[in-house]
């Protein structure tokens, strides 16, 4: 049966990097018989220029009807003066809401060939391969709030942290299912020594664990987890945590790899999921053909794994990326003397040749 992929290039380098990822998907399709077809739509500043909105209804409808969404990047200086509600970045927020994307998966894997680029010591980084599973639509970011009120003669503001058992149950099950595809370990991160919501979080995760006895579970307080990511990141397999903690830990973990051009993410929904690199639209290099496509190509691998359940194809794409790097190919963001200088096209070709 044919699987439909909605491709949303977006702005800046988005077109170049999504073209690279689609080329790799097509090669994987030919190798593994995936029967993929592609449907292209606008979002971000490009859509605003054409339609007066960063997320046209047609784009959202196409995304909802697809088997997976491959997203490039949005934004740029060109749209800095646009009304805030119409800024390019509103496109991704609208897609998250419209698709009901409840979890964000942030893989952090450091290829042996890239250990030297990490700010951490090589002996700490070698072998890092973890995934942060972050709850995306609950918690303090979506709770009640007050910007300003007077109480006891002082101005104050407040935000409400709120989690329900079903919300935690859903994200915990995703974390355990993810661990089953990997090394079989989940670390649940909370602040249960202080926060009531974290105590509910921990109780619920432990209850869900009863259905996943083949997966190991441990718990860390968020402050300790932040330290452990810097001290011994190889200890982690799957980290499961709430929205606020996950936001912070994901950005900390992203630094471990040494290049934002390599980083990818998956936003998981009940029906359709969205896959994108974590870097921006880089308008300063748009059209120059020098953007690193690997983050987007690895996003396509996540699409194969999580939306299409094509694990062999996903692993083959990831292995091809690792092999191209091991053979010395480097885009300008990673190039140093002694390596093979590559642009977007030649790096993509190097990966295709190894798939």
What positions do the PLM features span?
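N-terminal glycine-rich phosphate/adenylate-binding segment common to multiple enzyme folds
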Residues: 49-158, 244
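Glycine-rich phosphate/diphosphate-binding loop of Rossmann-like nucleotide-binding domains
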Residues: 6-23, 28-29, 152-223, 235
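Glycine-rich phosphate/pyrophosphate-binding loop and the adjoining helix
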Residues: 137-138, 143-182, 186-188, 192-194, ...
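Glycine-rich phosphate/nucleotide-binding loop
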Residues: 45-47, 229-329
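Buried hydrophobic positions in well-ordered alpha/beta secondary-structure cores of metabolic enzymes
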Residues: 11-14, 67, 133, 175, ...
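N-terminal beta-loop-helix "entrance" segment that forms/cooperates
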Residues: 33-57, 227-229
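Extreme N-terminal starter segment of soluble prokaryotic enzymes
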Residues: 1-5
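Buried hydrophobic packing segments
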Residues: 21, 25, 205, 296-307, ...
């Amino acid at each position: 049966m044919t699987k439909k992929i909605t491709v949303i290039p977006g702005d800046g380098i988005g077109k170049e990097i999504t073209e690279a990822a689609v080329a790799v998907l097509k090669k994987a399709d030919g190798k593994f018989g995936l029967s993929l077809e592609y449907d292209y739509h606008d979002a971000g500043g490009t859509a605003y220029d054409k339609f007066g909105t960063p997320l046209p209804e047609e784009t959202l409808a196409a995304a909802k009807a697809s088997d997976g969404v491959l997203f490039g990047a949005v934004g740029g200086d060109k749209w800095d003066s646009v009304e805030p509600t119409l800024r390019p970045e509103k496109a991704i927020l609208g897609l998250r809401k419209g698709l009901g994307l409840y979890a964000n998966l942030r893989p952090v894997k450091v290829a042996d060939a890239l250990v030297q680029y990490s700010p951490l010591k090589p002996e700490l980084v070698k072998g890092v391969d973890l995934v942060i599973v972050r709850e995306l639509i609950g918690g303090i970011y979506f709770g009640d709030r007050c910007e300003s009120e007077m109480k006891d003669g002082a101005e104050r503001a407040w935000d409400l942290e709120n989690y329900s058992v079903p919300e935690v149950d859903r994200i915990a099950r995703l974390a355990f299912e993810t661990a089953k595809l990997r090394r079989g370990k989940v670390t649940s991160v909370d602040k249960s020594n202080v926060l009531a919501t974290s105590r509910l979080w921990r109780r619920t995760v432990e209850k869900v664990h009863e259905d996943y006895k083949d997966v190991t579970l441990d718990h860390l307080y968020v402050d300790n987890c932040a330290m452990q990511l810097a001290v011994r990141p190889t200890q982690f397999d799957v980290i499961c945590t709430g929205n606020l903690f996950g936001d912070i830990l994901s950005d900390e973990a992203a630094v471990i790899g040494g290049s934002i051009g390599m980083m990818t993410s998956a936003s998981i929904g009940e029906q359709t999921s969205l896959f994108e690199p974590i870097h921006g639209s880089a308008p300063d290099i748009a059209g120059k053909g020098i953007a690193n496509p690997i983050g987007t190509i690895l996003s396509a691998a996540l699409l194969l794994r999580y939306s299409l359940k094509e694990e062999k194809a996903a692993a083959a794409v990831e292995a091809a990326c690792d092999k191209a790097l091991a053979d010395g190919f480097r885009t300008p963001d990673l190039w140093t003397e002694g390596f093979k200088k590559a642009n977007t096209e030649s790096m993509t070709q190097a990966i295709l040749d190894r798939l």
